[in-house]
UniProtKB/Swiss-Prot annotation:
Lineage, opening ranks: Bacteria, Pseudomonadati, Pseudomonadota, Gammaproteobacteria, Enterobacterales
Reaction(s) this enzyme catalyzes, per UniProt: (S)-4-hydroxy-2-oxopentanoate = acetaldehyde + pyruvate
Gene: mhpE
InterPro entries (UniProt xref): 2-IPM_HCS-like, 4OH_2_O-val_aldolase, Aldolase_TIM, DmpG_comm, DRE_TIM_HOA, PYR_CT
Annotated organism of origin: Klebsiella pneumoniae subsp. pneumoniae (strain ATCC 700721 / MGH 78578)
Family membership: Belongs to the 4-hydroxy-2-oxovalerate aldolase family.
Membrane spanning residue stretches: none
Keywords linked to the UniProt accession: Aromatic hydrocarbons catabolism, Lyase, Manganese, Metal-binding
Protein name (database record): 4-hydroxy-2-oxovalerate aldolase
Binding site for substrate: 14-15, 168, 197, 288
Length: 338
């Protein structure tokens, strides 16, 4: 770590959206953003779980617009930067500009790990706006470390100043993370930062984040009480406690984070965010974590097991954006069971 300060990127108000089907109220967003700001995090990501303009029939409708959520969070902070997420093809340049005008100063442009080239325009435009521009390679477990590094290079060439390894399926272990960071570091410019976005489906969210930092990672994504898709993200308060024990500089108030997690966030969970039969299946099968609630709904509708649906999705190598295939898989299983 050599005494550098970690950049703590909170995702409670974006990835955490998945855990409550994108239903945060504006008051809740203000309360949580305010608490995170006081606790000293560097950035607070705010958007529908699937990024700007994710509110849709396919992904689930949000209680509010991204812009309303971003404005609410921006009004509640004095130190932290407001971040947002954009998936090219869902969000447009127009949406990014609107988010910037509403107060977002960091954008993470997210693509499937093998499709960095779809982000070129959005990354370039974010740089033009003067935003802190991050490339976000989702489902990073699905390609080799060397292939991932080539995609990271593309994002860097478009103008991203930080590249993330994103374990959307919560499917990687510490060796997988180590290998990917070494591969990225071997090809990226020394001034290009790196980040880690973990999911806790195999209970390795914190361990994987620690290994990333050991390999030179600069930014860590985490959320209060792990609020996020699947078994959630690396729980922020747990990661900070572990980082503290390691003597790492993080600039946040552990007790304030612990209080916010238990008093503000955990009570909102209508389905516990934890490792259980279904969320473990996500990590084991390497499935996109936000498929959880959609698969549980399909299982209920067709009288199937959510685990069977998730395992089949893993076999078919489905990725984010293919939510419509969940019903397809359910109907196939139904016919198979006849």
């Amino acid at each position: 770590m050599n005494g550098k300060k970690l950049y703590i990127s909170d995702v409670t108000l974006r990835d955490g959206m998945h855990a409550i089907r994108h239903q945060y109220s504006l008051a809740q967003v203000q309360q949580i953003a305010g608490a995170l700001d006081k606790a000293g995090v560097d950035s607070i990501e705010v958007a529908h779980g699937d990024g700007l303009q994710g509110s849709s029939f396919n992904y689930g409708f949000g209680a509010h617009s991204d812009i309303a959520w971003i404005e609410a969070a921006a009004a509640a902070v004095s130190q932290a930067k407001i971040a947002t997420l954009l998936l090219p093809g869902i969000g447009t340049l127009h949406d990014l500009k609107a988010a910037y005008q509403a107060g977002a100063r960091v954008v993470r442009v997210a693509t499937h790990c093998s499709e960095a080239d779809v982000a070129a325009q959005h990354i370039a435009f974010a740089r033009e706006l003067g935003m802190d521009t991050v490339g976000f390679l989702m489902m990073s477990h699905m390609i080799s470390p060397q292939a991932l590094a080539q995609q990271a290079l593309k994002m860097e060439s478009y103008g991203a100043t930080c590249i993330y390894v994103v374990d959307s399926g919560g499917a990687m272990n510490m060796n997988d993370i180590r290998d990917r960071f070494r591969a990225l570091k071997a090809v990226l410019k020394p001034e290009t930062a790196t980040g880690m976005h973990a999911h806790h489906n195999l209970s390795l969210g914190v361990a994987n984040s620690i290994v990333a930092v050991e390999e030179g990672c600069d930014r860590i994504d985490a959320s209060l009480a792990g609020m996020g898709a699947g078994a959630g993200n690396a729980p922020l308060e747990v990661f900070i406690a572990a980082a503290d024990k390691l003597g790492w500089q993080h600039g946040t108030d552990l007790y304030a984070l612990m209080n916010a997690a238990d008093e503000l966030v955990r009570p909102l969970q209508d389905r516990p965010v934890r490792v259980d039969r279904e969320t473990l299946a996500l990590g084991y099968a390497g499935v996109y974590s936000s498929f959880l609630r959609h698969s549980e709904a399909a299982a209920k509708r067709y009288g199937l097991s959510a685990v069977d649906i998730l395992v089949e999705l893993g076999k078919r190598r489905m990725v984010g954006g293919q939510e419509d295939m969940i019903v397809d898989v359910a109907l196939d299983l139904l016919n198979r069971n006849k």
